Amino acid sequence: MLDNKKEYLKDAMFIRDMAMQHEQLFRESIPLIASENIMSPLAMEMLLTDLGFRYAEGLPHHRYYQGNEYVDVIEDKTTELGKRLFNSKTFDPRPLSGTNANMAVLYALTEPGDKISVPPLSGGGHISAAKFGAVGFRGLKTVQYPFDINEMNIDIDGTIKTIKNERPKVCWFGQSVFLFPTPLKELQDAFNEVNARVVYDGAHVAGLIAGGEFQDPLREGAEIITGSTHKTLPGPQHGMIIGNTDDDTWKKVQRGVFPGTLSNHHLNAMAALGVTLAEELDFGRDYAKQIVKNARHLGEKLYEFGFNVLGEKNGFTRSHTLAVDVSKNGGGRKVAENLEKSGIILNKNLLPWDDNKNSQNPSGIRIGVQEITRIGFMEDDVTELAEILRDAVINEKPVNEIRRRALELKSRFNNIEYCYGNMKPYSYIKIFE
C-alpha cells in the first residue's frame, strides 16, 4: 500500500551499510576490549524474536499487561538457571545493564545523604560508583578505599581503617580494571562492626565467578552481586542482580528494578541471557579456565618482551584483564589509536597514579582476552599476539605490516566456541531483501 514511500530509503540503507562495515571491522580485527564479548548463535536468535516488541511490567504471573503467558515461563526459567549457575538464593534477570542493576540496588539499600564506600576510579573503580555516576545520582556521600599499587588491589589495612572510621551504610566493591579478587574475607570483621551492607559489582568477572576461576563473593561476605551480562559472561548487553539476602531486602531490590529504575525489561535480551546461562552451565568452567590461562600467559609474554605490565608480583592477573603502563611509549591514547589502525582494538585506561582529569590521555591501556578466547585462541596464539603487540608498540614497525600479521592471525579463528551449535563470528545476519 505504501510501497511508493521510499524518500528516505537511502538513509536507512546507509545505516545498514555502516552496520555491515562495522561487522567487517571486527571480522578483520583482534578484539581486546575487556568489557565486550560475542554471543552464541542461539542467544543471537533470541534477539530477533517478537519478544523484542513486547512489554512485561512487574513480576511473572503478576503482570500489568496481557500476552505474557510464554514470557513468564521464559523469565522463570532464566531465573532458575541464574540461581543454579551462581548458587544463589535469588536472581533477577530484568535490569537493562550493569549500571541499571547498580541503580536498582542503591535505590533499595540507601537514602539520599547516606554514606557509601567505593573503590577509587584510578584504581579501576567503575563510573557508576563515582560521584558523577549512579552513586552521585542517588545523592550519596562517597568515601574511597586506599589502593595498593604493588598489589593492584585495595589496601586491606587501609580499607579496614576507612570502614571503621567512616562507618558507611554500604560497602561497594568491584572494578572495571579487575585484576585480582577483592579481599572480602579479610574485611568481614569491619563490615560486621559497622553493620554495613556489602555489594559486589561483578560485571567484569561474572563468567569467571560462575566458572569457579575467580572468587565466590556470596560465600566470602557479599550480600548482593550486580553485573552486566556481556563480558566474561558472554551474553547480551543486559543486566542481572544476584542475592543471598533476606526476603524483605530482596523485595526492595525487586521494587528498585521495577518500578524504581525501569518499566519494560527488553524481553528478547532476557531470553538471550537465559540461553547464555544454560550454555555457561554446560561450557562455562572450561571457558573461564582458558580465559585465565590466556590472560596470565599474555601478561608473562608482554612482560618478557619489555612491556610494563602491572601486577607482576601476583602473576599479572587472576582474571581476563591486563593493565599495561605505556607512558614511555607515547601514552594510552596514542598506543590505542595506533593499534586500532593496525587491526587491534583495545582501550586507553587510567592507572592508579593518574589524575582522573587525564582520562582522555592516561598512562595505560587495558587488555581483555575473553573475546579472543571465545573464538578459540589458546596459549600459543596468545604468544603470537604478544609478538605482534611488541612489534607494534615497542619496535614501532609499520602499521601495514602489523595489520597484515594481525589479520592473518585473526583469520584462523572461524567459529564461536563454548556454546551450542556453530557459527562463523562477526557474520552479518541479513533479513531484509
From Swiss-Prot:
It holds the Pfam family SHMT. Its EC number is 2.1.2.-. Pathway: Amino-acid biosynthesis; glycine biosynthesis; glycine from L-serine: step 1/1. It is an enzyme of class 2 (transferase). The record marks H230 as: Plays an important role in substrate specificity. GO terms for biological process: glycine biosynthetic process from serine; tetrahydrofolate interconversion. This is Serine hydroxymethyltransferase. It comes from Picrophilus torridus (strain ATCC 700027 / DSM 9790 / JCM 10055 / NBRC 100828 / KAW 2/3). The gene is glyA.
